[in-house]
Amino acid sequence: MNKLSFTLMLLFFCQSIFAVNGVPGPRDCFWSRGPHSGDPYINLAYPDSNVFYWAATFSMPDGAELNIKGDFPYARYMSIISYDGQGRPIESLADYLIEPNKKAVNPFSNGNSRLDQERGYEIKVLNKAPTDKRVTGRIASTKSNNVLHAPAYGPNQQTIIYRIYLPDRGTAPLGNVKLPDIKVNFEGKTLDKDQSCKLLKSSQSLAISLDAAGIAPMEYRKLASQPDKPVTWPAKNPPEWYIQLDRQSLIGIYTGEFNNDAPRSTGGFFPNLDNHYLRTIVNRKYGNVLILRGKAPNTPNTFNGDPKYIENELRYWSVCSNQSFGNTRVNDCLYDEEIPLDENGFFTLAISKSEHRPRNAIDDCGIAWLPIAENGDGVFDDDVAIVQFRHMLARDNFPNSIQSVENQGDIKAV
């Protein structure tokens, strides 16, 4: 495939990252892009297959006030996060930062009922940059005042993404609530949803940079097939792990050039500021099956409609098999509650193509399994996959979180 074809393919990906044609699921004139997850419709920018995503792209006129009103979902987590034109996060307004309406309950506050029917909230979106940066990946002590900062980029465009992680059993994708509603106050009038969408131009095309959703396939192929590197590059056996920093450090997996001063999760691909990520590249040329074993962090139990939210070491963790930085597709993910653990809290995970799945890689034998795609990285190497762990909202006193890794050199110690 020539360079022009690769460029056109990435352009198509960027324009279709939040496309909706033919995608089943709820949406409206504002939340018009989604829902997407680890599905065949819109599988891009490393989605977690246990999460549902909706995006809104809009432009607030000067003097307009945008309010979003909704109900907290029956789920593990929800947030609304703003992004720039390169797919980098600006601010996360996570569930626990949102004050509920009067007489309502926030089901994501420690010790609160998860099942209370009065669970409404209302937030305000501002077209300006935040003056203070909240801590990422951990529970912030600062208040949000129910405000999300979503500054415009490029052609006066703003983008926010609404996430619902792990809806309770039988409630997907929205967690047994409706999509958040919007209203705009403008020039002394309060506009309804349809009027607001028209004013905000919420049907406009997405105007993001070509590399916001992934590394250009031509560049990816060049990085992964350097003439002075082995054919397995950059995979190693045993695997070498990398935290997510900026785009330079992502490419550093292939070049060795890391920016340890970079803030976390600033490399694009629309990451969640409440997660920190750890990943490795694997290659089947070392063997058909990769076995990983580790101690599982403790998280709240929610999937089976548990009545009370009890804070734990992490809010959520998962492990995913992805194709590559060249197409950013997810093969599948496993979330904390579904991963079998032994009596000491350790998990064992096998990763392989389906034809080489070990016969004992089933829950009854205590071994989890994730697939490698039949076409590998989806670009040129059928043997490649990315394995990625997510740790969400770690407690400060939990020393073994990905959040505790300050730089690449600390990974083994943590």
Where do the language-model regions lie?
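Sec-dependent signal peptide recognition
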Residues: 2-9
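N-terminal signal peptide c-region/cleavage motif recognized by signal peptidases
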Residues: 14-16
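A compositional/structural signature for long, glycine/proline-rich flexible linkers
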Residues: 20-414
